[in-house]
Curated annotation (Swiss-Prot):
Subcellular location: Secreted
InterPro entries from the UniProt entry: 4_helix_cytokine-like_core, IL-5
GO terms classed as biological process: immune response; interleukin-5-mediated signaling pathway; positive regulation of DNA-templated transcription; positive regulation of immunoglobulin production; positive regulation of podosome assembly
Protein name: Interleukin-5
A GO cellular-component term linked to this record: extracellular space
Keyword Cytoplasm carried by entry: no
PANTHER family: INTERLEUKIN-5 (PTHR48491:SF1)
Lineage, top ranks: Eukaryota, Metazoa, Chordata, Craniata, Vertebrata
Length: 134
């Protein structure tokens, strides 16, 4: 019995380790970018006089274009160094990933039931994952 428990714990540990080994590369890229952003925030702020249009809408999923326009403005107006270049390189890779995902939005025509199923899931995401406006 004890041997079975030890084997079960060993298998659980192996599954846990392998789950981390297969972590999504985009998640790692975003985590690294957040760290770089946090580390170089003061450098990016500079003298604080740069004005960048910032969406008022809290649902950032709706403002992707505006967010990346702001990133381009920041990139063009910021003195570059090796670390800041890495930040902008990561942001560019994230933008490319999002653009590839957006191409998946186009779909073929299906019967209305399939669309209604999709619409139901879409509304569920809005209901649970989007920040409500006050």
């Amino acid at each position: 019995m004890r041997m079975l428990l030890n084997l079960s714990l060993l298998a659980l540990g192996a599954a846990y380790v392998s789950a981390f080994a297969v972590e999504n590369p985009m998640n790692r890229l975003v985590a690294e970018t957040l760290t770089l952003l946090s580390t170089h925030r003061t450098w990016l702020i500079g003298d604080g006089n740069l004005m960048i249009p910032t969406p008022e809408n809290k649902n950032h999923q709706l403002c992707i274009k505006e967010v990346f326009q702001g990133i381009d403005t920041l990139k063009n107006q910021t003195a570059h160094g090796e670390a800041v270049d890495k930040l902008f390189q990561n942001l560019s890779l994230i933008k490319e990933h999002i653009e590839r995902q957006k191409k998946r939005c186009a779909g073929e025509r299906w019967r209305v039931t399939k669309f209604l199923d999709y619409l139901q899931v879409f509304l569920g995401v809005i209901n649970t994952e989007w920040t409500p406006e006050s």
